[in-house]
From Swiss-Prot:
The encoding gene: AP4M
This protein's UniProt keywords: Coated pit, Golgi apparatus, Membrane, Protein transport, Transport
Species this protein is from: Arabidopsis thaliana (Mouse-ear cress)
Listed name of the protein: AP-4 complex subunit mu
Cellular component terms (Gene Ontology): AP-4 adaptor complex; clathrin adaptor complex; clathrin-coated pit; cytosol; trans-Golgi network
Main location: Golgi
């Protein structure tokens, strides 16, 4: 795989990092890319796809905490490989800097360029391993003080669990010591699940899937061996059980369709007691990736009704009910619903006492948007929208509106019930007792309700 250029742009289009490896693509590619992304309106889509071609140049990009990580090339390369490379470069830089934002990039541009020159040579990838790079990187990171950091959604998804973990968990460099030269011995394990659910217009589940990963980030000196135990009732493959029954709270076992492990993981006792053994490499890495298609109880139930209210009017009612326990809080919830193309105006009515909620009608793409700051488990929220049309509608209005889609983050909650039962670290001495942090988070990948 070969790329010509790599660069990082801010949300404003400012060029933060730029490296031209092969001099095959015009120097103005950064401006071409940003202009294309900012004003993308092809095929009715508001956002540019991760891959597109302009004047014979292929542009690949991923957006990480508000920054565009971009690669360009004129040759035909595997899109999935380039997108994975961009994600890994972002992860390596985050491992070294502790946090990804403009400030940390600008304070550490010498280190960032040193990393890029080791990761990619003349357009060819050499390594994306933080552990391997430590032997070749000699610049020390300038760690940005946590007080200077602005809250960023993807990096702050665990803040709801502050009582369980330190607030600086996601802002530490794996190579820089804490002030005073001492390094705090600790390890973080994150169980992150992205769920995809499609509801029928009657509220029944049509498709459901979980893409999960167990991420580990180690700040342990000496690379001690770690044993990580999962549910004893974990099964790989469906084992002939029905895939249409909800699992009860008592549990009938966790059934994964398939999974794969990091190369450092040893599976000697996995079949007998579901224990993983490994010596963690430096940096953040996925211990295990897994997929589950057995039907599960979705965290939110969405009911939507749209009906005519006159020749040029209609009313929409969207009701959301949280199906998780009351001690769990979901945050950064966004509900979107495409409206008929001839919608000219929308007025909204929220329930009495509604707080932390915003509504908007995006006229450019005829989109209804409802943002909620948080939803407590067991809570129910309703939005009413009155639509005004510029012309009479003919036929069934439900065929010209929807579906309703949701995005959300639920800290300290996972729908698959996969759990880390214990995290054991080989002791160097009787007084060695590093901090262990285990965190769970559920996010929406594709959460859609038809109307």
């Amino acid at each position: 795989m070969m790329i010509s250029q790599f660069f990082v742009l801010s949300q404003r289009g400012d060029n933060i990092v730029f490296r031209d490896y092969r001099a095959e693509v015009p120097k103005g590619s950064t401006e071409t890319f940003f202009r294309k992304v900012k004003f993308w309106k092809e095929d009715g889509n508001a956002e540019a796809p991760p891959i597109f071609n302009v004047d014979g140049v292929n542009y690949f990009h991923v957006k990480v905490v508000g920054l565009y990580f971009v690669a360009t090339t004129r040759v035909n390369v595997s899109p999935s490989l380039v997108l994975e490379l961009l994600q890994r470069i972002a992860r390596v830089i985050k491992d070294y800097l502790g946090v990804l934002n403009e400030d940390s990039f600008r304070k550490n541009f010498v280190l960032v360029y040193e990393l890029l020159d080791e990761v990619i040579d003349f357009g060819y990838v050499q390594t994306t391993s933080t552990e391997v790079l430590k032997s070749y990187i000699f610049n020390e990171p300038i760690v940005v003080s946590p007080a200077r950091l602005q809250p960023i959604d993807p990096a702050a998804i665990f803040t709801q669990g502050a009582k369980r973990m330190p607030g600086t968990a996601v802002t530490k460099s794996v190579v820089a010591n804490d002030p005073g030269g001492r390094r705090r011995e600790e390890i973080f394990v994150d169980i992150i699940e992205k769920i995809s659910v499609t509801f029928s217009s009657s509220g029944y589940i049509l498709t459901s899937e979980i893409d999960g990963t167990i991420q580990m980030k180690s700040y342990l000196s000496g690379n001690p061996e770690i044993r990580l135990a999962l549910n004893e009732d974990l099964n790989i493959g469906r084992g002939g059980r029905s895939v249409y029954d909800y699992r009860s709270s008592s549990g009938s076992g966790v059934i994964l369709d398939d999974c794969n492990f990091h190369e450092s993981v040893r599976l000697d006792s996995f079949d007998s007691d579901r224990t993983l053994s490994l010596v963690p490499p430096d940096g953040e890495f996925p211990v295990m990736n897994y997929r589950m298609t057995q039907e599960f109880k979705p965290p939110f139930h969405v009911n939507t009704l749209i009906e005519e209210a006159g020749r040029l009017k209609a009313e929409v009612i969207i009701k959301i009910r949280a199906e998780f326990p009351s001690d769990i809080i979901a945050n950064t919830i966004t509900v979107q619903m495409p409206l008929p193309n001839y919608t000219s105006r929308a007025s909204f009515e929220l329930e009495p006492g509604a707080a932390g909620q915003r509504t908007d009608f995006k006229e450019s793409n005829k989109m209804l948007e409802w943002n909620l700051k948080k939803i407590v488990g067991g809570g129910e929220h309703t939005l009413r929208a009155k639509l005004t049309f510029s012309q009479e509608f003919h036929g069934n209005i439900t065929k010209e509106a929807g579906p309703v889609s949701m995005t959300f983050t639920i800290p300290m909650y996972n729908v698959s019930k996969l759990q880390v039962k214990y995290l054991q670290i080989a002791k160097k001495s009787s007084s060695y007792n590093p901090y262990r942090w285990v965190r769970y988070v559920t996010q929406a990948n594709s959460y859609v309700a038809r109307i």
